[in-house]
Each structure stands twice: as structure tokens, then as C-alpha cells.
Curated annotation (Swiss-Prot):
GO terms for cellular component: cytoplasm. It is an enzyme of class 3 (hydrolase). NCBIfam families: mfd (TIGR00580). SUPFAM superfamilies: CarD-like, P-loop containing nucleoside triphosphate hydrolases, TRCF domain-like. Pfam families: CarD_TRCF_RID, DEAD, Helicase_C, MFD_D3, TRCF, UvrB_inter. Residues 633-794 form the Helicase ATP-binding domain. The lineage of its organism: Bacteria, Bacillati, Bacillota, Bacilli, Bacillales. Couples transcription and DNA repair by recognizing RNA polymerase (RNAP) stalled at DNA lesions. Mediates ATP-dependent release of RNAP and its truncated transcript from the DNA, and recruitment of nucleotide excision repair machinery to the damaged site. It comes from the Bacteria. Keywords: ATP-binding, Cytoplasm, DNA damage, DNA repair, DNA-binding, Helicase, Hydrolase, Nucleotide-binding. Its EC number is 3.6.4.-. A motif (DEEQ box) lies at residues 747-750. ATP binds at G646, D647, V648, G649, Y650, G651, K652, T653. This is Transcription-repair-coupling factor.
Amino acid sequence: MTILTTLIKEDNHFQDLNQVFGQANTLVTGLSPSAKVTMIAEKYAQSNQQLLLITNNLYQADKLETDLLQFIDAEELYKYPVQDIMTEEFSTQSPQLMSERIRTLTALAQGKKGLFIVPLNGLKKWLTPVEMWQNHQMTLRVGEDIDVDQFLNKLVNMGYKRESVVSHIGEFSLRGGIIDIFPLIGEPIRIELFDTEIDSIRDFDVETQRSKDNVEEVDITTASDYIITEEVISHLKEELKTAYENTRPKIDKSVRNDLKETYESFKLFESTYFDHQILRRLVAFMYETPSTIIEYFQKDAIIAVDEFNRIKETEESLTVESDSFISNIIESGNGFIGQSFIKYDDFETLIEGYPVTYFSLFATTMPIKLNHIIKFSCKPVQQFYGQYDIMRSEFQRYVNQNYHIVVLVETETKVERMQAMLSEMHIPSITKLHRSMSSGQAVIIEGSLSEGFELPDMGLVVITERELFKSKQKKQRKRTKAISNAEKIKSYQDLNVGDYIVHVHHGVGRYLGVETLEVGQTHRDYIKLQYKGTDQLFVPVDQMDQVQKYVASEDKTPKLNKLGGSEWKKTKAKVQQSVEDIAEELIDLYKEREMAEGYQYGEDTAEQTTFELDFPYELTPDQAKSIDEIKDDMQKSRPMDRLLCGDVGYGKTEVAVRAAFKAVMEGKQVAFLVPTTILAQQHYETLIERMQDFPVEIQLMSRFRTPKEIKQTKEGLKTGFVDIVVGTHKLLSKDIQYKDLGLLIVDEEQRFGVRHKERIKTLKHNVDVLTLTATPIPRTLHMSMLGVRDLSVIETPPENRFPVQTYVLEQNMSFIKEALERELSRDGQVFYLYNKVQSIYEKREQLQMLMPDANIAVAHGQMTERDLEETMLSFINNEYDILVTTTIIETGVDVPNANTLIIEDADRFGLSQLYQLRGRVGRSSRIGYAYFLHPANKVLTETAEDRLQAIKEFTELGSGFKIAMRDLNIRGAGNLLGKQQHGFIDTVGFDLYSQMLEEAVNEKRGIKEPESEVPEVEVDLNLDAYLPTEYIANEQAKIEIYKKLRKTETFDQIIDIKDELIDRFNDYPVEVARLLDIVEIKVHALHSGITLIKDKGKIIDIHLSVKATENIDGEVLFKATQPLGRTMKVGVQNNAMTITLTKQNQWLDSLKFLVKCIEESMRISDEA
């Protein structure tokens, strides 16, 4: 984009502006948003000061940020995102927005140069005093001394929470001399101390808990945007007490009790850990002299104001909203007199003393003394939308008028295509810049702005893809911390005390933790399990692979089995029978599929390539991989049967569209089968739009078509005139004949009835089939079905999707009104989820009184199919603002303009349901909002509380997501295998079920379970060998290490575990050293055919297998073991060698030496 700034820099108008910008009060008029951004960016580039750009709201700040990222390095661009809604202060904060705010405040506190975009609400917000913020900036360096207690105390002030193992943002832990911290910005950090000196600082991976790279120094940023010290708490106690006493007599008696509950809920007087998320509501009482953000800026900062009049309008409504919000919470006993979140001074007063540059599109009167007014003439660019003739004549005009023409396109490929298009129009163009650019020609460069503009006095025109092709600008995202899929899904397997488990031999019990028991003078760790009644079972940790976490459908509480009863055996036998039946079916399907002959497609055609380049977005890596897998299938003679699995809105349709186009290019027909009329309409419109420039005949068969049109479509399918048909189950009727059907695409197959599914099966025989589903299919289950259906998964969301901002709040009409008003004010729509059909119309009336001007519709499952579809369609077409609905919206319908979801009684929903419902919003490049409301002052059940806690963590794809994934996976398994199996999965738990199914399938296919290469070794030594709680306090971490030790088969793995223990928990004690010695002995034994090593008090017995006995070279063994002298004796029992070792002082070392000698004495067998 340097060409743009170079052209602007040389212009006289800009030079006039540059002289007064930041020097005196100036009004700049006439510039469109993108032209304005170009000027501001150039001013910033030429100065050494901080530049503050004030906007009226966050939406405007986001838009300007996207354009500014084209000119300014992301490292120097900051935003202070505050929502235009008071309710935010009362709910769980979004970590994304909070980390952006902290990044901004930290940069300002350090005096960094940067361009800072702040919406009005952010400018007025009460903040931590600047000096206090500066005192809590910490930079740690290797070699420095720290006062550990003081340091940990500071972390707590900064909003960090102490845990035994760090797994989420905002946590820290202390183990021995190791401190782990997961800051909001940057990588998780591990600090190792030598007494009080920092010995090393390392990044570490939260998933594996292993260190990565050493760093010399690290900045620790706060984990909350408020600092709360002990002094702050004691000031707050006094202020809040006074506020409570002032408020109590002035409110209605009926709510005084509520006020008391609110006052006590902050737990200021009995707690030691303070939740910053909750205390932020009391910011007005926290500090003696709170700051606003302007006090964080340098005294010579440059200030630019975007659209002064808009800011004043927003300020007025903000003041009114804030006043009514505060009065509402006071009147309902939820707040106190004196509570506020913003400074009420006028916006001009806040920036007094600074020279300000005001940007306004139109000349306007302002109550401000201005020193200069600079007028620009700026015109919008004609919208071409691909109309070649208009484009040519406009470009010709620019050339004739000797303009500098800058064309911005978003990818390198498009640069080449644009140049080819301009050369066809005989417009001179270049793509590489050499120093300067002569006028009267076009330069095509990679880049994007929200819109083009023409500055006639400068002789400059900028044209973007928006004018050329109606493309939306792609969101430029600053790098955010991505959470890997493994991390999302891994930890639902984590065992917590109280979880249900399944023991392969004993059935369903409860996990009570790891206990160290003394058995015959030695200490060992056992897993303690509770069964029916008072039965308890202690499982040695080295047999832990027989215990799995019980995972089944959400809210299914399993029945505990009785130890020693026959009930579990019967249950397993039943499941075994059903699993074998399924295995039988799967094998038949598999054989059938292998035999079937289908059509073999050729490589991609030139049209295919052109068609794919036409896609206005970048494919995600998962999309690209899925497309390749599908094309590979189509290019084989065996018919494709592939399942494409991806969350709603993750781009499955584009993948399907490309497959459809490939089929049509080879003269084949495509049937696109969907479960509902509305979905049919949406897919039909997508196909029409995507294929408009290609000779493809697309038709729709659904209730929205007249009988005459349906008849014509059937005729067209029969003659081959129709290439692609989209439709509901009408496509499955017997009287439809295709001339040459090549591809069947089925969307959400599980939503079709049994009869329709049968019909789909018959169509499948020698046609390629692609099935799309938004319900995730568990990989473990899929593995056991390998070869029956192939699976492609799209797990990455498209580039420009924002995470949905999720709030968990008490039900309150003023919160609801504010959320509705905010969405409608940005011309959006709202889903209002109310799951009680009997009173849903009353709810609509209630909302209508709240929002008299809104159009409100109702949708629920008891309406006729036709009425429901009409309502949904009207909502999609923007005829209604608010849709009051039951969970009927959970699947399928795409309403990109609906970006707010409000759910009443969210505590009654399952997590997976909430997760899928939340996927309804945030579907466009706008931020989506989800409000989960629960009744005020209602005592929640434990499950509901856990669930809401998990939903709060949804805001960062935390554990809530994992639980939802788990439940959805089970739902997916049920869809794949049928309803009856769902019940069986619930009786034995998901993991055991998958394992049984896999074994049954393999057995039927004649695949023997691979005999373990190395036989099981039993090592039983009278030693204290375990992981003491003093060394590893966290039980999950302990189990994880035991699992690794159990799986160890090589010395490299042992070294790796030793490294991990030292890295995560510091030097290990003698009990752990012995445990590692035993594992080392076991590895030698595995490699040499030893089957048993048993401690019998004074001697140790070692047994070899017959095969190992045949392979051992006796001579080599006797030579090697001479140092052991008479302590070792050799014998033979049942053709197998036995060795006894008499115990002496260093007997453990002797045993290690002996097993090593045995391994080294093995002859390498000829078969190897």
C-alpha cells in the first residue's frame, strides 16, 4: 500500500493538513471513511507521538481498524474495545476483548508509540489509577532475585487465580521451585527458581505441560483490566458499606432483602480470593481517584475525532441509558446509589488541553473554537459489480483525465486476472512498482479497503473488489491465541474425583481418587473406586488401563454395579450381541462397496479451475483437504460414500458445490437432498449465485414451486436438460427419473425418516454419495467402521468469524431491553429462545411492550409445517426483527443477519444444545452476542451450576466446549449406528462400546488382534515406589504420569519421562527414583523375554519364557554376570530358565545390572 501513501504525501492538500494536524483545533471535511484512514495513517507514519482516534462506538472502531491494518503494522495498532451496553459490566467478560484492553493499557502505561482506537464508551470508562497500573507491570529476567511471596501476591492483585496445574488463561501455580503462569497475552511461562534467584524462564505447552524454548526475559501482563490490592479491598469495604446504608432506606421495602443479598454476594468480608469478574461491577467504589484512559496517554499525544456529531448523539443516549440502567438496578435491589461505570463529564472536557483534529464527511457547525478548516473533495467510486461495459468506460475516463488509478485485490491470483481483464479493455496497467508511478495508468496491488474513493483534486482513484465484484472486504485479523483441537477435546477424558468410571471386569463405579496404601511394609498408589452400597475396589495404578471414564449422553446418570454380582456380565453380553450384529451389517456393506462399479471421473478441467478461483474467500486448510479427498474418491471407479462433518457455517456447502460442479462438467447430473424446504431454498440460492457465470441448469423441487414447475423439472431431469436439482424428500419419489445421475449430496441424513433413508440406500448403489452433517462424528468410532464410509472433517472456522461474545446473566428486563436495542440499532435481528410453548405468545406480548416498534414473530414445533416455514422464511428475508422461538432453531437454518441470541432459563438446557444454539449467531463478519439468562435468586441445582460455569468458559472455547463435544460425539454415534445403539452406549459407556465394536468388526473381517509383540511382564518388588502427593499434588497429573510409565517400552521414553518430571515438578524424591528404576527393569525384561520378576524377601526370582531360553547365549551371560558372583543362581523349570538373585546391600542396582546382562546375551534370531 506504499504507493497510496506516496501519492498522498506529495499532494498539497495533505501537506496543508499535515502542518496543523495535532497542532491546533482543526476541522477536516469531505473525506470518505477509507480516504480518511489513508490520511490518518500517513500522519501517524510521519510523527513520533501516540495518536488517539476516537469513534462513536465499537462497530465503527472495528471498521476503521480493518482499514488501518493495511497501512500500519499490527504491532503498533491498538484498540480499546468496550461494548456499547451496560449489561456487559454484570456478566462474564470475553477474554478476547479483555486481552485487547489490557494490551492497550499496558502499551500506554509503558509510553509506547502507537495508533490507539478508542470508542466513546471506552474514553469515559472508570479505570485503575495509572500509577497503580504502572506498578503492576512486571518484567522478569534470568539471574534476577525475586521475593516469591510478594510476587505471588502481585499475581493475585492482577487477577490471576492459583491452581495446582495451569490449564486456562489467567491461572498460576507453584510446585517446589517452579512457578507456572498463563498470561492473557503471550505464551504460558514456566519460571524455575534456585532459592530466590530466577534460574531459567521457559515457554511451555499447556496440553503436554512440557517446556519449549528458553527465554531471557518475559513481560507478565495483568489477567484482568482492574488491579485489586488489599488496600483497594479495604477502601471498597468502607465505600460499599456506606453505599448500602445510603441505598437501603431509599428503596421499596419489598426489595430490601434483595439488596442485602446483593451486598453479601460480593463476599468482601469472608473471602480471601476475590473474583475480578464480579468485583468490576463496583469500580465506582474501588479507588480513591480512579483514572480514565486519557490519563494514560502522553501529554503530547495527537487526537483525532471521527464524526463529532455522531459522537455527541451517542454520548446523549449513553448518559440516558446509563442513568436508567443504574436506577433500574437500584430499584430492583441489584445495585447501590453512587454505582456507575463511566465518568459523566462531557466528552470535550475529557480531551481538554489537547489540540484536536475533527473529521466530518459534511461541513457542520460545532460548539468548538476552530483554528483551521480544511475541505477535501472526495467522490465515491461507481459500483461496477462485474458489468464489463460500465467498467471499461469508467477506467477509460480515468486514463483520459490522467488519473493515478490504484486497484486493490485480495490475492496474487486475482492480481493476474485483473491485469488480463484490463489489457482486454486496452487500459495500461502494471503490477510491480519501480520507484514512482506515472499518471494515466493503473497499478494493481494486493490489499483491501472497505470501499474505494476518488480524490479529483489529487488526480487519484482507488478501486476495491467491493466496487469491482461486490465482494465483501475480508477481515484482517490480528493474531490471536489459537486453541488446538487436541486441547479442546482431550480433557473430557480427564478423571475428576466423583466421576463415573467403567472397569472392564467390574462395571460402572465412581472414581474417588488416588490413594497411597501400605501393603506388607511397602507403599504403593492405588485408584480407589466406589461401587454399589459400601463396596470399594482398589486398583493398582499399573492396571489402570482397565479403568475408563464413563462417557455417555449428557445428564445420563448411570447405575452403579455391585462388586462380584452377575449383573455386569449380563449387560456386557447383551451389548456384545448387538455389537456383533452391527459388525455383521458393516462387513456386508463393506463387501458390497468393494464390489460396486461406479463412474470414474477425470482430472479437473480448465472450467473447474476458473470456477474455483471465483470463490471470494480463502479456503481453510480443512476445506482444501476435504475437497482433495472428495475429488480423489470421484476419480476412482469405486462409488464414493463420504461423510463430510463440520460445524454450522464452517464452509461445508462450498466443498459440496465444487464436487457438484465437477460432476456437471463431465455431463453427469447432481441431486442435492435436504431435510427442509427452507434449507432447499438457501442451498438453491447459493448454487445459483456461485454458478451464474457458467452454463449450468439448476432447478428446485419443494413446496415453494408450482405443480407446473415441478413437472417441467421432472421432464428436465429425464431428458438431461437439468444438471443440478435441489430438493426435499420429493427428490426421492419413485416417479423421478434421472438421465444420468452421477452425484447425490445429502444434507443432515439423520433428519430423514426410515422410509426415506431406505430410498437413499437404493440410490447409493453405483452413484457417488456425499453426506454433510454438523453433528461431529467421533473419530474412535469412525476408526472401527473404516472402509464402510470415508470421513472428512472441517474443524477450523472461516477466517473472518469472530468468536461469539457470550454473557451469563441473571434474568432482568432492563438487560434484555438493552440487548434487543443494541442489535436492532445496528439493523440486525434477534433470536429470543423461550422453550415453553404454552406461554410463548404471552412472552411475545411482553417483549412487544418492551420494544413497541419491533416486528416480532413466533416459531414453535406445534405449528403446522407450512406456517412454520412461512414464518422462518419471512424472518430470513428480514421482515421480522425478533423471532421468539423454541429449540426448533437448533439445526440447519442460516440467518446471517441475526447476530444476537437470548436464551431464557439457560440453566435448563444441555451443554451441547447451548453450544449448537450459540452457533446460530456470529455467522457473518459481524460479532455475534449470546445471552444465557438464569432466574434471579433461584437456587440452581449442582448440574445447572456446573453447566453455567462451563458456559462461562465457552467464551474461550474452554472445557464447556469439550463437554459439548463429548455429548455431540455421542449424538453423532447414535446417528451413525441408529437409535437402539444409543441406549447400549449409555449402559457401558462410549469408550468401552467403541472398543467392543472395533474388536467385533476386526474379528468378522478375520483380522486378528495383533498379539502383543512383547508378552506382559510382572515385576513385583518390595519397594516404596510411587508418586508422593508432596511431589505431585494434582491427581490428574499423577494419573497422566502413571499412564505414561505403564506404556513405556523403550529407554528413550524413560529419559523423556525423567525430563518431564524435572521440567514440571523439579527434582524427584527417592520414591519416584525407585519407580523409574522399576520401569527401567521392566523395559529390559520386555526386550529379553523375562515374564516374571518377584521379590520373595531374601531372594528375587526371575523367570524367562521358553522362547527366550532358546535364544539366550549362556556363555555370554555367565561372562557378563561374573561381578555378581555367588549371589546369582541359574536353574531350569519346564524347559524355561529361572534365575535367583540373593539380596544384598545394593540389590536394586544388582538387579538392574542382571536384567541388562540378560538382554545383551540374547542371540538375534534369524527370522528378524
